[in-house]
Amino acid sequence: MLHLQKGSNTLIRVWASYDWANSVYFLVITSTIFPIYYGSLFADNLYIEIFGQSLKNTALISYTTAAAFAVVAILSPILSGIADYVGNKKSFMKFYTYVGALSCIGLYWFNLDNIYFGLICYFFASVGAWLSWVFYNSYLPDIAHPEQMDKASAMGYSLGYVGSVLLLVVNLSMVLNPSFYGIEGTASEASVKAMKYSFISVGIWWIAFSQIAFRFLPKNISKNPLTNKVIFNGYRELSAVWKTFSNHPILKSYIGAFFVFSMAVQTVMLIAAYFGEQEINWGSSSEKQIGLIVSITIIQLIAIVGANITAQCSKKFGNLPVLITLNFIWVSLCLYAFFVRSPMQFYIAAGFVGLSMGGIQSLARSTYSKFIPKTDDTTSFFSFYSTSQMTGIVIGMLLFGTIDQITGSMRNSVLFFLSFFLIGAFLLIRIHRRMTN
């Protein structure tokens, strides 16, 4: 096998290629086609009797998402501990890639008649996507030097945006012109079938393009045997990482700030398409389909620019000032979203979300990479990072779903999350002042 040196452009591109493979899940399943399909299932009634409760459809998907992230938050320390000790994080990355991709294919059979099976597939698709992401993130310090991390992180997100948009364009073509692809039925029936075929395309794309990273990323082989004690190494290592934070107060403060603003960013992004599907006054179902896909496409395309602009700004002004600015932009976006009702207003919001979304995600990751101490145990530090992110999403989705269920409006949930961006900005300002003083 070809051995690629750390810091080489080829190795960085190989690592970033997994973003190209994996990001189609986040765009097609999380953000566009699946939310539209899911909303179409509840066209006549937003509520469903399930688990002995009458739940609003958006609250149900919020709770299911929270459950998936709870599993990820619990398993991530265990699996990363095993991977770091045994040296097989690529094997775990492969396994959860296949779990996620095959579950996406299983979404083809999602309907109200077998709602439980559909939710299970949605659940495991999310688990697979995010657990594979844990091990992917942990490779960043292994493939890039500190001065390369911002650029490498931005390259990953940019490739992910481009690749996912390419597949989305194909899926959009299928949904809008199903007869061209030989999909039969009435216009409405054929469009729904095309959405289901889109789920299959995500699974195939994800599996196919992930082979590049699987082929060339370093294996980190270790001869340490797997024992019962190793299973809980992850939690012991997380505890050790937490103790390490005591010697690195800036890093400890940063992970706290990250927990708050990441919870808000990830939650808002996970429900954005459902918000657009339910809260915006679209003229017709076809206009809704086109409008939502166009909105998310705008987000993805502008996010490419946003991620690179943010990387350039961080070089000039520093990471923390840029992160603080991005948090205040998100405060404005949440306030604006509360009043958004027309498609044009939604498109404007989508543009600003795109500019700030890619930037805050890539910069948050690379900033953490710079703050962690020099160590060979990068997996445990990134496991702590990912566990914080996942735990935040669990709390965020539960809060969002509960407010939505009680008030009957997603607008109130979005407005509530404005407070988390304010807290995140305040915490980052404190860190910046401590560093400058």
Give the label of every model feature segment:
Residues I74-N88, V305-N319, D404:
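Helix-to-loop junctions at the C-terminal end of transmembrane segments
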Residues S91-G106, P321-Y336:
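Structural signature of the two symmetry-related core transmembrane helices
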Residues Y108-C121, F338-A350:
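Helix-loop junctions at membrane interfaces in 12-TM secondary transporters
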Residues L55-T58, P146-Y157, Q289, S369, ...:
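Loop-to-transmembrane helix entry/capping segments in MFS-fold secondary transporters
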Residues L2-R13, P218-I255:
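Juxtamembrane intracellular "pre-TM" segments in multi-pass secondary transporters
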Residues I12, W109, W205-F216, I360, ...:
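Multi-pass alpha-helical transporter architecture, strongest
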Residues I29-N57, L270-I290:
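Short amphipathic helix-loop junctions that connect adjacent transmembrane helices
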Residues S54, V175-I204, T402-F421:
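A membrane-interface helix-boundary motif in multi-pass transporters
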